[in-house]
Amino acid sequence: MKTIIALSYIFCLVFAQDLPGNDNNSTATLCLGHHAVPNGTLVKTITNDQIEVTNATELVQSSSTGKICNNPHRILDGINCTLIDALLGDPHCDGFQNEKWDLFVERSKAFSNCYPYDVPDYASLRSLVASSGTLEFINEGFNWTGVTQNGGSSACKRGPDSGFFSRLNWLYKSGSTYPVQNVTMPNNDNSDKLYIWGVHHPSTDKEQTNLYVQASGKVTVSTKRSQQTIIPNVGSRPWVRGLSSRISIYWTIVKPGDILVINSNGNLIAPRGYFKMRTGKSSIMRSDAPIGTCSSECITPNGSIPNDKPFQNVNKITYGACPKYVKQNTLKLATGMRNVPEKQTRGIFGAIAGFIENGWEGMIDGWYGFRHQNSEGTGQAADLKSTQAAIDQINGKLNRVIEKTNEKFHQIEKEFSEVEGRIQDLEKYVEDTKIDLWSYNAELLVALENQHTIDLTDSEMNKLFEKTRRQLRENAEDMGNGCFKIYHKCDNACIGSIRNGTYDHDVYRDEALNNRFQIKGVELKSGYKDWILWISFAISCFLLCVVLLGFIMWACQKGNIRCNICI
């Protein structure tokens, strides 16, 4: 009896060696996969607010260098002078005479140190001179007759002596007369001329007659295109530098071929010449950031910023080729594929699961690739062609976004007088609306680009899979998880031919068909076929043993077999 049971057990073991799936020498497994990282980056697409990708680039510049770079733009530091003070010739701003700039930087510590003045349209004059980019001044010989020139004031010291604005000529009575002044100055040049002039407003009637004789003066400045008539307003004003009188500053632009006419019977602050007007992209900015030796195309009041990103939220005010201002603190552009972190699976094929299962964190030499298992072991290799195809289409994406958004001009500060408050409110509303619109457009643009990138990288993966499937044809079976079961012996050279596209399926066709039919004849189409086969085998062995035991007991009862039990 022992002999029979032993023979039965040996028979079962021999049978077990012939179960399908135990001979891996005649088959191989090839899986396609893509790159993955342990911790990806979340980006936004049209269809998903948060989708993880292997790599992404930040598109919003959110910090400055903290200093204004002096290259490539020519920066003129106003230090203690405003641009208008430098224009008029305030004594402490004499160092700015005939200066040029791309960007004039006004400081919060700037102050006036001459006769108190106001400019009725200060912002327009400031912007006009700033955009010209120069304080180049040409003296002209105006013929003022019967009056005293070069008036000065103790409120405008030039050294120890009383002085005045260097670009203006204060005219007052000569003796006891102030004759009517009527002078002309033609523009025979080929460029516009900017004339700065003013009207003096005495604080009392006595001051008025002491300086100009007449109780009421009048100043008229005209060209062929315009005329301005100003009547002085005599009256006391708040005291500034020991004076309660004021000067109002005006300007006139004389075109080539036009003529300047000045008529006055008193209170005239006359021009000494003209400023050359130039056209360009010069500007002005209020900032307390220091000026440093560095290079940057984009300048904000906070300091220079790089312009290698399409958007910035450092400051609305900019100069140069700058990223577009948006409200968002961050906008990320996907520069990698959809990230599916690798799962630590177990099992015969768990270690080389395909792209449908999860990504491959170990693949660092490409975005797409192959893993295989054959009689020579396991291996992995990247597919450089599909990787390069995806990279080529993504590489130019950032530059294209920058080209669409970077401003090649500056966003200047806008100022309005108090009486223009409603205009200022409207301007602010328009600017805020523009920023809202650009912020929305930026988010939409990035979401569209991210959607395209993910669709593109998914498409390249599918192209590689289809290319492999067309090569293998009936020699392999698609296992449905990104892997192929190859029904012929496929060594490393064979695997390499599949990867590089030189695989000849006809060479292996007969072997593959033969192996497929042999395996399929006994293979169960279930996800648990191996378990079912082993359970069936165990039950069969158990039943065989029961039958043998029953036969032995029956034979013992009939006397054909004698069984002695010794204790």
UniProtKB/Swiss-Prot annotation:
It is a single-pass type I membrane protein. The record marks R346, G347 as: Cleavage. This is Hemagglutinin. Binds to sialic acid-containing receptors on the cell surface, bringing about the attachment of the virus particle to the cell. This attachment induces virion internalization of about two third of the virus particles through clathrin-dependent endocytosis and about one third through a clathrin- and caveolin-independent pathway. Plays a major role in the determination of host range restriction and virulence. Class I viral fusion protein. Binds to sialic acid-containing receptors on the cell surface, bringing about the attachment of the virus particle to the cell. This attachment induces virion internalization either through clathrin-dependent endocytosis or through clathrin- and caveolin-independent pathway. Plays a major role in the determination of host range restriction and virulence. Class I viral fusion protein. Responsible for penetration of the virus into the cell cytoplasm by mediating the fusion of the membrane of the endocytosed virus particle with the endosomal membrane. Belongs to the influenza viruses hemagglutinin family. It comes from Influenza A virus (strain A/Victoria/3/1975 H3N2). GO terms for molecular function: host cell surface receptor binding; identical protein binding. Residues 1-16 form the signal peptide. Keywords: Clathrin- and caveolin-independent endocytosis of virus by host, Clathrin-mediated endocytosis of virus by host, Disulfide bond, Fusion of virus membrane with host endosomal membrane, Fusion of virus membrane with host membrane, Glycoprotein, Hemagglutinin, Host cell membrane, Host membrane, Host-virus interaction, Lipoprotein, Membrane, Palmitate, Signal, Transmembrane, Transmembrane helix, Viral attachment to host cell, Viral envelope protein, Viral penetration into host cytoplasm, Virion, Virus endocytosis by host, Virus entry into host cell. It is found in: Virion membrane; Host apical cell membrane. Gene3D superfamilies: 3.90.20.10, 3.90.209.20.
